[in-house]
């Protein structure tokens, strides 16, 4: 089974891209889809209705959505394989820029909107720098100069990334992506690990402590003016 992880900020066009991939590959591959989100998601319903493919969704609840994705992915891969799928597509919530959801197998695709601003790639960290492919959407809504600046910014963050520009609603210029999916290796689920390093650790805010100010917290902390070495860890 092949695997595709699609990440990107909200409203960048991730689901529109998933629909184009499904529409173009469904005749040759059986596709399964998992949506990971926080509060509400309807993408699984839309894809099941439009393409009659097996779909599921997971709400992360109190977990970071990408942490939740790591937690459920083993079971999700087993579910997709048991569904007889040749291609498993996972769409992340796109909310945690530090916790890149990509794996060391399969393909990782980041979806970026042309109208998100030219500095967006620099702010997105590992979501861009660890992706295999960047799909830039809504190219019909910006000028050629803006497109070129955005492309340059993406290349500065990740010089080796493959860049594709598209209007995902119409599916223009995506044939290269379809070919890459076809040619990608099948995953070995028992050997899957995250492509990048996760954040340093869990802070006391993550586990529910509400007080404001580092003095009230312990573990991994951060001060306004402290150097990294002295603000990295504080005992109870």
Predicted region positions:
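Nucleotide-state-sensitive switch-loop elements of NTP-binding domains
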Residues: 2-104, 139, 172
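Structural beta-sheet core signal
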Residues: 33, 110, 134-136
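Inter-motif core of Ras-like GTPase G domains
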Residues: 92-116, 123-132
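Short, structured coil segments at secondary-structure junctions
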Residues: 50-51, 104-105, 129-130, 157-159
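Short, surface-exposed amphipathic charged segments that create phosphate/polyanion-binding patches used
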Residues: 69-74, 172-185, 204-209
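P-loop NTP-binding site
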Residues: 2-16, 21-26, 184-236
């Amino acid at each position: 089974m092949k695997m595709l992880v699609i990440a990107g900020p909200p409203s960048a066009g991730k689901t529109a891209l998933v629909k184009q991939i499904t529409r173009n590959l469904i005749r040759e591959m059986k596709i399964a889809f998992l949506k990971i989100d926080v509060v509400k998601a309807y993408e699984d319903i839309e894809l099941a209705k439009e393409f009659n493919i097996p779909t599921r969704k997971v709400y992360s609840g109190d977990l970071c959505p990408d942490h939740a994705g790591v937690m459920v992915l083993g079971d999700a891969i087993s579910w997709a394989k048991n569904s007889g799928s040749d291609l498993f597509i996972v769409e992340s919530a796109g909310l945690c820029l530090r916790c890149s959801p990509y794996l060391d197998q399969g393909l990782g695709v980041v979806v970026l909107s042309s109208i998100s601003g030219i500095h967006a790639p620099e702010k997105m960290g590992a979501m861009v720098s660890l992706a295999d492919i960047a799909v830039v959407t809504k190219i019909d809504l910006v000028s050629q100069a803006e497109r070129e600046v955005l492309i340059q910014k993406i290349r500065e963050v990740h010089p080796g990334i493959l860049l594709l520009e598209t209007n995902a609603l119409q599916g223009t210029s995506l044939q290269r992506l379809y070919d890459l999916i076809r040619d990608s290796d099948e995953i070995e689920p028992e050997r899957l690990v995250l492509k990048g390093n996760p954040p340093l650790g869990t802070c006391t805010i993550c586990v529910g402590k509400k007080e404001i100010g580092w003095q009230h917290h312990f573990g991994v902390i951060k001060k306004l003016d402290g150097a990294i070495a002295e603000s990295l860890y504080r005992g109870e």
